[in-house]
A protein has these predicted regions:
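Bacterial N-terminal signal peptides that target proteins for export
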Residues: 1-6
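Bacterial N-terminal signal peptides
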Residues: 8-15
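Extracellular glycan-modifying ectodomains
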Residues: 19-357
């Protein structure tokens, strides 16, 4: 009973917070001048179930410690998945002229580390994602990034001590999105980056595990060549946009993931030098923070809305900003969490109370 209660708390935290395969997997290191080396895609996508490598997993509360890393174990049911799909459908049925809608669901890290002895510990991500897609309207463009991410499973794509994907993991999600959206993804081969070392994330904070403490993370963020004007908006007005910076470079330590978009702002906007007529809004939780900056390489305008905190006139904002593409990007837990689904639905009702975990 105690484990079940703790699991419900963890699922709520995972959907609500902003915030390597083994300890030998690179965690990027502290060198702030490095560029990310992206490995070429292998020809064959690896199987989901890996051979038994002798590694033993230990449950500490709702965190599964395995291969010197922390994981949450997904077990979402189809009923909640269908409710999520119905909410996405409701935006399609508003029939906003010229608005193209995408849905991208992000798997969690354990999906790519399952070994034979633990194959029944968590529900396969693709089973849950495809069940949602099956319940969605055909007009919605559905993006399952599992295969693209799996091709890179030996890279540093999820944190060791935190539930989020790294910026490299988010990059492979971005590549999946580009394939569906008819875009050319930027190559990271020559993009400079900076790194924030010494990151101990949510799993460490929940468990205080010495195993996780001895396998700390680092947070890498990319310095893209195109100039970006970054603005912070408000729920109270469609016209207020205060100029700021896309990266909160002052953060460190346990807050390092908040470098992306300054954490979980209710709404922010990025305007670029691209003049291609493509303007996108994202509805996200914190997984979207590391993902969103990549879109500045492809869109003239990117607006990011956190459904947990934004209570303004969302539909009015889409129209006022000339948005013609709408992406829902949520991790697989959030897509099966009642309060999160409720808050996405509530965006169509300005000022409605926010559901809590």
């Amino acid at each position: 009973m105690k484990v079940r209660f703790f699991l419900s708390i963890l699922i709520g935290i995972i959907a609500f917070t902003s915030c390597n395969n083994s300890s030998s997997k690179s965690n990027d290191g502290p060198d702030t001048s490095l560029t990310e080396v992206v490995k070429k895609d292998p020809v064959v996508i690896p199987d989901r179930i890996l051979p038994d490598d002798g590694q033993v997993g230990v449950r500490k509360g709702a965190v599964f410690i395995f291969k010197n890393r922390g994981f949450e174990l997904f077990s979402g049911g189809e009923t909640m998945g269908r409710q999520y799909a119905q909410v996405i459908n409701s935006y399609n049925r508003l029939q906003i002229p010229g608005l193209k809608i995408y849905n991208l669901i992000v798997p969690n890290g354990f999906e790519f580390e399952v070994t034979e002895p633990y194959k029944d510990k968590a529900k396969p991500a693709t089973v849950a994602i495809e069940a949602i897609f099956k319940a969605e309207d055909p007009q919605i463009i559905k993006i399952n990034p599992v295969d693209e991410i799996r091709k890179h499973r030996t890279e540093y794509i999820y944190f060791n001590t935190d539930h989020h994907w790294t910026s490299l993991g988010a990059y492979y999600g971005y590549r999946s999105f580009c394939a569906a959206a008819g875009l050319t993804p930027i190559s990271l081969d020559t993009i400079p980056s900076k790194v924030k070392p010494g990151f101990l994330g949510l799993f460490y904070r929940l468990t205080k595990s010495s195993i996780l403490k001895n396998n700390p993370d680092s947070v890498r963020y990319y310095l893209f060549p195109d100039s970006v004007n970054f603005y912070i908006g408000t729920s109270k007005s469609l016209n207020y946009w205060g100029k700021s910076k896309m990266y909160a470079e002052q953060v460190s330590g346990a807050n390092s993931y908040s470098v992306f978009l300054q954490g979980d702002l209710p709404i922010c906007k990025m305007e670029t030098q691209h003049k291609n007529g493509r303007r996108i809004a994202l509805v996200k939780e914190s997984y979207g923070n590391a993902f969103s900056p990549f879109l500045t390489n492809n869109y003239e305008k990117v607006i990011v809305v956190d459904s947990r905190y934004y209570s303004g006139d969302f539909i009015g904002m889409l129209k006022a900003e000339g948005i013609n593409e709408l992406l829902f990007i949520n991790n697989i837990f959030a897509a099966h969490t009642p309060f999160h689904i409720s808050n996405i639905k509530g965006l169509t009702n300005p000022g409605s109370p926010k559901a809590k975990p």
